[in-house]
């Protein structure tokens, strides 16, 4: 299927490709039901829809503190760090949503925006470190809220890449050029995060997906219900959230099993007078 191959070439993950194809199939099926498309010719018949478990992407508190507290000179590396932390502070806001965020989306102490991927409206409280980042770049990147959709201005600096065009065709071309610039800038920021990871001596390279997974994992560790985490991330179902957290849940189960079965290799526990030691299951 050409569209699927196009999405893969764009670098989208298997899960994201499956998401877009399933939405397209739903539109096609509705068109068939309402008589806008012929029956008996299903273009999705040979397309296999699958969802992969994501590898561990969350980072621990030590890494977060190291990244947030790193003393960096003004420049692109500091911008990349600020964008990573902004995503964490915004409940794991997706990079594409940060790119298109505008000052009008900021109302007092909250950010109100709609996820570009699923159209889900979200409201995020602005905490002090997030406010500091927004204030730092507000004037530089207006009419955007964060310095992602930027392009060199030919004078040694950068300017926002705004959509232009006086007619629909011209505006459409400009939007396509803007999106291409977004993809190029996303690649640049990922390279900067890899460089920052090496500089800080991190075991794994940071990515913006890590910020999203980290928020979800920390929330789950704090005992926040799955339904709340799912809504906070803007997922349309808890199934997607569970993909994020499967590895964390598996680790908690392993820890529980270690506690339950620890008597096998603890001779002291076999004595009648021995009291159970270690963590309680309720503490996991």
Regions found by a protein language model. Give the residues of each.
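Alpha-helix N-cap/helix-start motif at helix boundaries, enriched for small hydrophobics
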Residues: 24, 96-99, 229
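Basic, Lys/Arg- and aromatic-enriched nucleic-acid-binding interface segment
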Residues: 39-95, 99
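N-terminal DNA-binding recognition helix of tyrosine site-specific recombinases/integrases
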Residues: 9-43, 93
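C-terminal secondary-structure termini that scaffold catalytic or DNA-interacting sites
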Residues: 142, 148-176, 258-284
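Short, polar N-cap/turn motifs at the start of nucleic acid-interacting alpha helices
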Residues: 104-110, 203-204, 224-243, 271-279
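Short, basic (Lys/Arg/His-rich) helix/loop patches that form interaction surfaces
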Residues: 69-75, 190-231
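Conserved tyrosine-mediated DNA breakage-rejoining catalytic core shared by Y-recombinases
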Residues: 46, 100-136, 151-152
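Catalytic-site neighborhood detector that most strongly recognizes the C-terminal catalytic loop/helix
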Residues: 58, 115-119, 233-258
């Amino acid at each position: 299927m050409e569209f699927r191959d196009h999405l893969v070439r764009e670098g989208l993950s298997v899960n994201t490709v499956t998401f877009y194809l399933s939405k397209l199939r739903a539109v096609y099926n509705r068109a068939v039901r309402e008589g806008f498309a012929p029956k008996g010719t299903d273009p999705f018949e040979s397309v296999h829809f699958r969802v992969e478990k994501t590898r561990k992407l969350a980072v621990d508190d030590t890494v977060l503190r190291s990244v947030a507290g790193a003393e960096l000179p003004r420049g692109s590396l500091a911008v990349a760090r600020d964008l990573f932390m902004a995503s964490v502070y915004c409940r794991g806001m997706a990079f594409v949503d940060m790119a298109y965020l505008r000052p009008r989306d900021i109302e007092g102490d909250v950010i109100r925006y709609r996820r570009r991927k699923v159209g889900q409206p979200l409201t995020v409280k602005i905490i002090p470190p997030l406010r500091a980042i927004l204030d730092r770049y507000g004037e530089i990147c207006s009419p955007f809220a964060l310095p992602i959709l930027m392009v060199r201005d030919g004078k040694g600096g950068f300017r926002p890449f705004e959509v232009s065009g006086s007619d629909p065709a011209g505006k459409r071309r400009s939007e396509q050029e803007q999106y291409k610039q977004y993809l190029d800038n996303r690649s640049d920021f990922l390279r900067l995060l890899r460089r920052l990871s090496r500089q800080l001596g991190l075991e794994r390279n940071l990515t913006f997906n890590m910020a999203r997974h980290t928020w979800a994992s920390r929330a789950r560790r704090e005992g926040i219900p799955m339904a709340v985490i799912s809504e906070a991330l803007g997922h349309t179902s808890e199934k997607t959230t569970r993909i994020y957290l499967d590895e964390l849940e598996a680790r908690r189960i392993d820890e529980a099993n270690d506690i339950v079965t620890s008597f096998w290799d603890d001779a002291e526990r076999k004595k009648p007078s021995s009291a159970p030691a270690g963590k309680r299951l309720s503490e996991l």
